[in-house]
């Protein structure tokens, strides 16, 4: 079992943790989150980005992690970036707790997400279904109020 965690911080009140667990290289990965400080009753995009570099804030993380050269999509789509996690929903206080299982995100192997950045976005991810070219790259999810590098957890 490999476990990892990203501690989310940024230039906003958004903060939290996202944890990852993968039993072995052939297993799906469980992604769990506890994120606070978002807008109430909203859907916010979150993605794994290419780089674990936050020297200039969350913008240094680069584009979505996309080792297979696909277009942006929903987590359940066959064609999507490895880093496409979709949206999480917030409650009346702007908080969100949840988990999902993902078949593309890996902690073990050549396409591991360890050392990359988990970014929470300021807008809703359109899951690549928008009319613009940007939809196929980013899901039009907007600014990056919080992020954290994915590191090995105890």
UniProtKB/Swiss-Prot annotation:
Its cofactor is Cu cation; Zn(2+). Its EC number is 1.15.1.1. Zn(2+) binds at residues 64, 72, 81, 84. Cu cation binds at residues 47, 49, 64, 121. One of its GO terms (biological process) is copper ion transport. GO terms for cellular component: cytosol; extracellular region; mitochondrial intermembrane space; nucleus; superoxide dismutase complex. Residues 124-137 have a biased composition (Basic and acidic residues). The keyword Magnesium does not apply. Substrate binds at residue 144. Disulfide bonds join 58-147. The keyword Cell inner membrane does not apply. It is found in: Cytoplasm. SUPFAM superfamilies: Cu,Zn superoxide dismutase-like (SSF49329). Binds 1 copper ion per subunit. Keywords: Antioxidant, Copper, Cytoplasm, Disulfide bond, Metal-binding, Oxidoreductase, Zinc. It catalyses: 2 superoxide + 2 H(+) = H2O2 + O2. One of its GO terms (molecular function) is copper ion binding. Residues 124-144 are annotated as: Disordered. Homodimer. Destroys radicals which are normally produced within the cells and which are toxic to biological systems. Belongs to the Cu-Zn superoxide dismutase family. This is Superoxide dismutase [Cu-Zn]. The gene is sodA.
């Amino acid at each position: 079992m490999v476990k990892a965690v990203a501690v989310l911080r940024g230039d906003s009140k958004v903060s939290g943790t996202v944890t990852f667990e993968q039993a072995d290289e052939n297993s799906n990965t469980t992604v769990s989150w506890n994120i606070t400080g978002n807008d109430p009753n909203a859907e916010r995009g979150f993605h794994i980005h290419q780089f674990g570099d936050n020297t200039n804030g969350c913008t240094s993380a680069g584009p979505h992690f996309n080792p297979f050269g696909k277009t942006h999509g929903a987590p359940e789509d066959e064609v999507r970036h490895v880093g496409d996690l979709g949206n999480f929903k917030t409650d009346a206080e702007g908080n969100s707790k949840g988990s999902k299982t993902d078949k593309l995100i890996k902690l073990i192997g050549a396409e591991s997400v360890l050392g990359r950045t988990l970014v929470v976005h300021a807008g809703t991810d359109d899951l690549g279904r928008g009319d613009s070219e940007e939809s196929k790259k980013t899901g039009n999810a907007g600014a990056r109020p919080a992020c954290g590098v994915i590191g090995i957890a105890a």
